[in-house]
Amino acid sequence: VAAYAICVRDGQLLLARWTDGRGRPEWTLPGGGMEHGEDPYDTVLREVEEETGYHVEVTGLLGVDSFRLTTRSRFRRPVDRQGLRLVYEARVTGGQLRPEIGGSTDLAAWHPLETVPGLDRVGLVDTGLALWRERPVTGRLPQKMNTA
């Protein structure tokens, strides 16, 4: 289970850059996995601060993204995993933009909303933006947008 934030300010989206398993940098929403015993609400506050330097206030729960990922273990056995990602809307209340030190991301930046489609990004960015724009009452998009 993980929690992520959609932070839009002055027509720009806050994103963090991470490197995927193939060594390719991609933009993602700030956020990440829950620590044992942690509430998802607290997870998103902690993760946004760790990855961007900003303190945020959660202004709403946009939805839940459920995904299934099938990979192979290092012993070539199939591994079938399911994950849940809670996507919150948040606004910056303090702090200063800075990169994460010693973590999973190496850069944080604001991107104009109209340039996001041209970025190398993970599918969660599109899912999060669709939840933000459409605000489905169920917290679920009508059609699955991404796998991971």
Positions of PLM-derived features:
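General beta-strand recognition
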Residues: 14-15, 98
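The catalytic Nudix box helix
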Residues: 29-62, 88
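Structural motif
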Residues: 13, 59, 81-87, 108
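Active-site-adjacent beta-strand/loop module that shapes the phosphate/pyrophosphate-binding cleft
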Residues: 67-97
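Conserved N-terminal beta-strand and adjoining loop/helix that marks the start
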Residues: 1-14, 33-36, 87-89
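Nudix hydrolase/Nudix homology domain
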Residues: 22-24, 97-148
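Short connector loops at helix/strand junctions that flank enzyme active sites
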Residues: 8, 22-24, 29, 56, ...
